[in-house]
């Protein structure tokens, strides 16, 4: 009788060990996925910063061209 109890206990312990092993593997996979996603987030943030700088530069260029155009139109009005 005690041998059967021991076998059942051993089977439960083995099942627990197998479950823990699978969970550890899943944790490692999730950690790797998390690291990958963090890298993607950092890359996206870096890209965003670059695009914001480029957008500001383009806005300044647009303002400069608008000023030039206004000046040119003003000169044309003076001629007429």
From Swiss-Prot:
It holds the Pfam family ZapB. InterPro entries: Cell_div_ZapB (IPR009252). GO terms for cellular component: cytoplasm. Residues 3-80 form a coiled coil. The keyword Electron transport does not apply. GO terms for biological process: division septum assembly; FtsZ-dependent cytokinesis. Keywords: Cell cycle, Cell division, Coiled coil, Cytoplasm, Septation. Transmembrane segments: none annotated. Non-essential, abundant cell division factor that is required for proper Z-ring formation. It is recruited early to the divisome by direct interaction with FtsZ, stimulating Z-ring assembly and thereby promoting cell division earlier in the cell cycle. Its recruitment to the Z-ring requires functional FtsA or ZipA. This is Cell division protein ZapB. It comes from Edwardsiella ictaluri (strain 93-146). The gene is zapB.
